[in-house]
Amino acid sequence: MNKKRIAVIAGDGIGKEVMPEGIRVMEAVADKFGINLQFDHFDFSSWDYFEKHGQMLPDNWKDQIGGHDAIYFGAVGWPEKIPDHVSLWGSLLLFRREFDQYINLRPARLMPGIIAPVVRRDGTPRQPGEIDMVIVRENTEGEYSSIGGRMYAGTAREIVMQETVMSRVGVDRVLKFAFELAQSRPKKHLTSATKSNGIAITMPYWDERVAEMAKAYPAVQVDKFHIDILTAHFVQRPDFFDVVVGSNLFGDILSDLGPACTGTIAIAPSANLNPERHFPSLFEPVHGSAPDIAGRAIANPIGQIWSGAMMLDFLGFRAAHNAVLSAIEQVLTPASDAPLTPDMAGNASTSDLGRAIARQIQL
């Protein structure tokens, strides 16, 4: 079987602790399914690298990782040492833009053994699988542009501007991906996040493109909500949603809120995709570097492991993806008595949980 080369970037904080468990599980499932994975480790995109070199990435970073089949990423950021906008714009956001990873995909599913903080209207707890949505976020333009600036800094006339950029190509390709995904799922339901009653130029354009794209997908039920009430609906009735698509900013907000509604953001995965595969796609947990718990060996590795499963799926190994998801669900099932990390009311270490999932795969 052809070798798949994976660029491994652990990054900062707990990224360095959860990444070994992600690789442990990837190696276990690769061994079971006869998949040839080569993991190449890189130390950049971290505070340690910045401290030594004065920049987040080497000048030839694209040459070093651009030929890989995928990037397996941990976390970046250490605000006490380096401002977030420096670490993010100097690494992760560069990966997304230079490698045209225009789809950010984040599933949010209520897993066994996890208590959702949002109950049903009658006060009863939600059951595993009752919340099962995917947030599709535009990942390369929108509100997160570098167009803008500061004038008259430090004076009473100080002005700060940052422009939102929406192109037809950029909007249409993320909407097409979202509609295709919705059409492939049982509910066939797509929700668009907007704010066209207040953001009177870019958001009406977004709405127009959604309406136009919907004509090509008559089997998909489409609705839209303004972002403020949409966040309320996420909390009140998360089971209503299936595929949710949003701009860079709105998708960013919703793709943290969605997993939070399922009980713990620590298990949430994400994929930054270049669907045409002209460049490597990047797979990372939703949680950040969490400096407050770094070094204590208590970080939950499931987000890293689940992101690895998404990577396997994108590389064409659907059965391996399913095996990893099944192992996660089995370990989280209360009857399994498996070791759990403190965020899930356990006292196990990061490696205890990673080993338990790897063992489950090997059964």
Describe these PLM feature segments.
Residues R5-I14, Y72-G77, L190-S196, W306-D313:
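Short glycine-rich or small-residue beta-strand-to-loop segments that form or flank ligand, phosphate
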Residues A7-R24, V29-A30, T155-D228:
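Glycine-rich phosphate/diphosphate-binding loop of Rossmann-like nucleotide-binding domains
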Residues D12-G15, D69, V136, A178, ...:
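Buried hydrophobic positions in well-ordered alpha/beta secondary-structure cores of metabolic enzymes
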Residues G22, M26, V210, Q304-L312, ...:
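Buried hydrophobic packing segments
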Residues G34-P58, F234:
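N-terminal beta-loop-helix "entrance" segment that forms/cooperates
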Residues Y49-M161, L249:
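N-terminal glycine-rich phosphate/adenylate-binding segment common to multiple enzyme folds
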Residues F50, F234-S336:
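Glycine-rich phosphate/nucleotide-binding loop
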Residues T140-E141, S146-S192, S196-A200, R318, ...:
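Glycine-rich phosphate/pyrophosphate-binding loop and the adjoining helix
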